[in-house]
Amino acid sequence: MNTTSSAAPPSLGVEFISLLAIILLSVALAVGLPGNSFVVWSILKRMQKRSVTALMVLNLALADLAVLLTAPFFLHFLAQGTWSFGLAGCRLCHYVCGVSMYASVLLITAMSLDRSLAVARPFVSQKLRTKAMARRVLAGIWVLSFLLATPVLAYRTVVPWKTNMSLCFPRYPSEGHRAFHLIFEAVTGFLLPFLAVVASYSDIGRRLQARRFRRSRRTGRLVVLIILTFAAFWLPYHVVNLAEAGRALAGQAAGLGLVGKRLSLARNVLIALAFLSSSVNPVLYACAGGGLLRSAGVGFVAKLLEGTGSEASSTRRGGSLGQTARSGPAALEPGPSESLTASSPLKLNELN
């Protein structure tokens, strides 16, 4: 990978992109940290009996909190233009981001499959939906997330830049390694989970329409919200990843040429947008809660999730998928495995 940079001062466009990234990351931190903390508090303190869905939502909020706790380090990097936290901090921050991204997307997939099974095979779902099974699934999700994020530890390093400055940067032995990492992340962190989510909710929508559920119209709107929110935050990021992978396979170094420079600019904003996805869940909870927010006050999250323990049986009675869907939107968003240092000043200065 090319680790040299131009000595020219950053252009106005680059400064604007960096400022926009700082704004997005600051909003994510300001909204997501208290929002997800409130969700964790609501489930742990306000719910006496936690359903399987509540346990998944709890883990999702914890994953979002983990990635948001790394945001101050990246904000410092963007503001100062240098990485000040050493090699261990570099790898740890990016590894936490990777684990959070995978944990979030796998939790989303698990919740989607759970919903689909509850509608398609309610009796089977009722037998499988135990806290013991949920804990095993959650443990498996976290173990798999830690494993899938390990390439970050192999490729991230701290490289010198200018005088007395350094960058936390991905350094690959070859362009083939860069292509592999980007494609691997796009496939495992978006494509396969997204296909599972779409298939699950498409099946739910088809079955609800066939059974003429009273709340199917509302459920349909929520399903669309779930899928669009998921895609809006992650599709652009992974499209850029795949475009970069294509350039790597063609032997073109990152950030070089007109296309490479534009991809580097876009990547700054899209990585910050992916961080912002970790703050959107509490907002979706509030939107899905409807009247509960007004009637239950600070306890609305607990009220929202209280009915999910009997989703399977209530689904058979034909009236509860509104509750099921209400818990769904909160599941759709994870943290990015690439931090803002992935589109570092090293690349941005090459745009001049």
From Swiss-Prot:
Compositionally biased spans, kind Polar residues: 310-326, 338-352
Domain of life: Eukaryota
Membrane topology category: Multi-pass membrane protein
Pfam family, one: 7tm_1
Gene Ontology CC annotations of this record: plasma membrane
UniProt keyword annotation of Membrane present: yes
Membrane-spanning intervals of the chain: 20-42, 55-75, 92-113, 139-159, 179-199, 222-242, 269-289
Keywords: Cell membrane, G-protein coupled receptor, Glycoprotein, Membrane, Phosphoprotein, Receptor, Transducer, Transmembrane, Transmembrane helix
Cited PANTHER family: CHEMOTACTIC RECEPTOR, G-PROTEIN COUPLED RECEPTORS FAMILY 1 PROFILE DOMAIN-CONTAINING PROTEIN-RELATED
UniProt family annotation: Belongs to the G-protein coupled receptor 1 family.
Name of the protein in its database record: Leukotriene B4 receptor 1
Encoding gene (name): LTB4R
